[in-house]
């Protein structure tokens, strides 16, 4: 543990359901003036950053849907899928035009309802799709939600560590409201990366890496990954993080596992005034 602290490798503790509990990390680094500028930048341009972030998030949902539709011809004529694509496209337009964070939150909630309303259709050849009706958490009530919650937590941990590494304050965000104990900027950053986690979850399910035997149902009704399920998921997650993807801003291939750090570094450059705008990650642009 001491060596990890010296090398600034975070050690995270999670509950069996994947909820973050605590972390061991080295001394906080970074220029205090960068954090002051972070506050100023987010106060001045927070709404525009949030609008771009949500537009990217909805675009990534559309990309995930289109990838599945491309591979499964029967979905091309599915009325619910067509309607969902239209709704998310309209969500992008509304996000770009809205004039307040409160309005943006409403648009995000509506788009999330649309997306997860058809999410089970993206799960092909695995009967766990039948257990998913809508997004639920704390606790997750079905296997698909259990995996989603676990993966989102992994992404959140990576984003928080990445932001701290580049010297930004992960607790001062531009979209998620400041709340004691919540890493609001990590919550912001993870929004553009959720699509990666969701595609990973779909791969696990569609290739039947995860099945019914990898979950336990609690007396409370919560459905959680068991030891075998967590082991399978974490093994595949590490494999995923080592594979490379094209980054449209850097114009080179980078491992998936470094994307939180790449985006955090770009955000830090924006805060320092080295970039005119911060560009969220669009999955459709990671394909040459």
Could you describe each region identified by the protein language model?
Residues 32-288:
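Active-site helix-to-loop segments that bind/position phosphate- or nucleotide-bearing substrates
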């Amino acid at each position: 543990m001491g060596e990890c602290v010296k090398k600034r490798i975070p050690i995270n503790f999670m509950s069996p359901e994947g909820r973050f509990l605590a972390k061991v990390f080295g001394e906080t680094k970074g220029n205090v003036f960068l954090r002051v500028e972070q506050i100023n930048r987010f106060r001045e341009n927070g709404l525009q950053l949030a609008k771009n972030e949500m537009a990217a998030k909805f675009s990534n949902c559309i990309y995930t849907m289109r990838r599945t539709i491309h591979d499964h011809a029967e979905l091309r004529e599915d009325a619910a899928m067509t309607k969902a694509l239209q709704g998310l496209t309209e969500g992008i337009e509304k996000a770009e035009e809205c004039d307040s964070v409160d309005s943006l939150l409403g648009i995000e909630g509506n788009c999330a309802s649309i997306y997860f309303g058809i999410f089970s259709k993206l799960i092909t050849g695995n009967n766990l799709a039948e257990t998913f009706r809508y997004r639920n958490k704390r606790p997750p009530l079905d296997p698909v939600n259990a995996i989603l919650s676990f993966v989102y937590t992994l992404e959140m941990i990576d984003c928080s560590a990445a932001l701290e590494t580049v010297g930004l304050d992960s607790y001062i965000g531009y979209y998620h409201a400041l709340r004691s104990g919540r890493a609001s900027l990590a919550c912001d950053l993870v929004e553009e990366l959720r699509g990666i986690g969701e595609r990973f979850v779909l791969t696990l399910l569609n290739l039947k890496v995860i099945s019914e035997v990898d979950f336990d149902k609690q007396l409370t009704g919560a459905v959680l990954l068991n030891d075998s399920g967590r082991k399978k998921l974490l093994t595949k997650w590490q494999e995923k993080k080592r594979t490379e993807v094209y980054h449209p801003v850097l114009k080179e291939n980078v491992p998936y596992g470094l994307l939180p750090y790449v985006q955090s570094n770009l955000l830090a450059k924006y805060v320092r005034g080295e970039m005119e705008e911060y560009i969220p990650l669009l999955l459709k642009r990671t394909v040459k």
